């Protein structure tokens, strides 16, 4: 009996010493024993349920009925409130006998004030479910309304990311939330992230918690057919950068600190083997279909593919995270002066989120290419680069040049100068980036304030 036990113990020890060949434990993702760690040793995937199909929006009333819902808050913005996506949702609710109230005052690029207005509406309504119909602004606003109406005694900054907020863990149960995205970019229907402008500091921040992710995302590609050209382009740039940044992010087991409790493990954990798969797949779709989707509104194959790619990238970055392009984008959007983007019906100056992200991408990936050059080269090749004579030391420059050509072909504004910024704005842009440590710390290459300033300077002109 003892001999048998000794044999089992010997076998277990041999297995522990064996070299594991799976992606999670080879090269980038190799792990040390989990004793006294300063960096994390685990990652987890938190994703909303997703249902995809043309005209699948018609099922939303049945879902709410199946859940026993009695009083629903439907959130959208004024531009969408009279259009077919919202009409399809409301028709389904009426058909299935669901009581609802419509909130159509969501602000495109929401602020803390617009969040609080929506939260107050939700608190007064005593809703038992939420529906968000729109782009990332609508879905993020609805997430916040669900959270704070479910935790009515919380201060607004309790759940906001540090250093602006307290970053408390969400421990209260939330109501079901169905997201119906009408753009192909943010991936917000799959993530536990809600982004807004904190007006006092003129900086973007947000709430990041798996608890606020939608219960269900209804991915209905029919809603993409009426998207204007620049909305398609700018939302597609968000998919592009979600994919690139999550794939090149600091690996999850190099991120610190190691949480003492799994509830404290951040939503943005660093690149990992599962997120990598979704990021690369989304990037391939962008490479194949984004230009077609922008140039031809009747190209159903391209527009439908990009709508799904947004969710694919959301699965990836919603767990791996993003880094410098997004971190630097927040002050670009927050400090906007007079720029008004084409095809956006808003009453205020606006640098659309996807545009604010992609304008720094050539400079950023030139900078990060030294740290994971193989991944930068792989991304460049997916986007069309010829690597036959490529040198690994040039990985960042190759990806940057590939991105410049891609953006030029899609008539993207020629850098930050084209959207109203000058060299004198760089200190404010750097200052606005510093609070974004939640994402910037996932850059594969550490950076100083001087290096951030150099990246903004390099992004003033693209071509």
Curated annotation (Swiss-Prot):
InterPro entries tied to this protein: ADH_Fe/GldA (IPR001670), ADH_Fe_C (IPR056798), Alcohol_dehydrogenase_Fe (IPR039697), HOT (IPR042157)
Q: Could you name the domain of life of the organism this protein comes from?
A: Eukaryota
Q: Name one Pfam family in it.
A: ADH_Fe_C
Its GO CC terms are:
mitochondrion
List locations, semicolon-separated.
Mitochondrion
A Gene Ontology molecular function term of the record: alcohol dehydrogenase (NAD+) activity
**Reactions accelerated catalytically:** (S)-3-hydroxybutanoate + 2-oxoglutarate = (R)-2-hydroxyglutarate + acetoacetate; 4-hydroxybutanoate + 2-oxoglutarate = (R)-2-hydroxyglutarate + succinate semialdehyde
The record's section on SUPFAM superfamilies has: Dehydroquinate synthase-like
Keyword terms of this UniProt record = Lipid metabolism, Mitochondrion, Oxidoreductase, Transit peptide
Similarity annotation: Belongs to the iron-containing alcohol dehydrogenase family. Hydroxyacid-oxoacid transhydrogenase subfamily.
Which protein, by its recorded name, is this? Hydroxyacid-oxoacid transhydrogenase, mitochondrial
Q: Which organism is it from?
A: Xenopus laevis
What gene makes this protein?
A: adhfe1
């Amino acid at each position: 009996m003892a001999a048998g036990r000794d044999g089992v113990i010997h076998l277990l020890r041999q297995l522990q010493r064996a070299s594991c060949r799976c992606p999670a434990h080879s090269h980038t993702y190799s792990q040390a024993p989990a004793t006294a760690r300063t960096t994390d040793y685990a990652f987890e995937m938190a994703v909303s349920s997703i249902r995809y199909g043309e005209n699948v929006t018609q099922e939303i009333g049945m879902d709410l009925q199946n859940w026993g819902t009695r009083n629903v808050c439907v959130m959208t913005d004024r531009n969408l409130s009279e259009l077919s996506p919202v009409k399809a949702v409301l028709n389904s609710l009426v058909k299935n006998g669901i009581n609802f109230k419509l909130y159509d005052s969501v602000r495109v690029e929401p602020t803390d004030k617009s969040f609080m207005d929506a939260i107050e509406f939700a608190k007064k309504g005593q809703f038992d479910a939420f529906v968000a119909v729109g782009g990332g602004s609508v879905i993020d606003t609805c997430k916040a309304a669900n959270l704070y109406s479910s935790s009515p005694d919380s201060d607004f900054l309790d759940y906001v990311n540090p250093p602006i907020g307290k970053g408390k863990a969400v421990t209260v149960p939330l109501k079901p939330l169905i997201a119906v995205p009408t753009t192909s970019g943010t991936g917000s229907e799959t993530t536990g992230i809600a982004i807004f402008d904190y007006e006092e500091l003129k900086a973007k921040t947000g709430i990041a918690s798996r608890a606020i992710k939608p219960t269900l995302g209804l991915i209905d590609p029919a809603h993409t057919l009426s998207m204007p050209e620049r909305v398609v382009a700018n939302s597609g740039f968000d998919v592009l950068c979600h994919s690139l940044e999550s794939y090149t992010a600091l690996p999850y087991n190099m991120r610190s600190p190691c949480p003492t409790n799994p509830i404290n493990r951040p939503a943005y954990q660093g690149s990992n083997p599962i997120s990598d798969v979704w990021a690369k797949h989304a990037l391939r779709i962008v490479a194949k279909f984004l230009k077609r989707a922008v140039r031809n509104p009747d190209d159903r194959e391209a527009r439908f593919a990009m709508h799904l790619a947004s969710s694919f990238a959301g699965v990836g970055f919603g767990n791996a995270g993003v880094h410098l392009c997004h971190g630097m984008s927040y002050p670009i959007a927050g400090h906007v002066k007079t720029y008004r983007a084409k095809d956006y019906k808003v009453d205020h100056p606006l640098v659309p989120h996807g545009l604010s992200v992609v304008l720094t991408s050539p400079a950023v990936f030139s900078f990060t290419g030294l740290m994971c050059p193989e991944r930068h080269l792989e991304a460049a090749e997916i986007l069309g680069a010829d690597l036959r004579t490529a040198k690994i030391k040039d990985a960042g420059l190759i990806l940057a040049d590939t991105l410049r050509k891609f953006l030029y072909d899609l008539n993207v504004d020629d850098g930050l100068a084209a959207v109203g910024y000058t060299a004198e704005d760089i200190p404010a842009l750097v200052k606005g980036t510093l609070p974004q440590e939640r994402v910037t710390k996932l850059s594969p290459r550490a950076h100083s304030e001087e290096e951030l300033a150099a990246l903004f300077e390099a992004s003033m002109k693209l071509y």
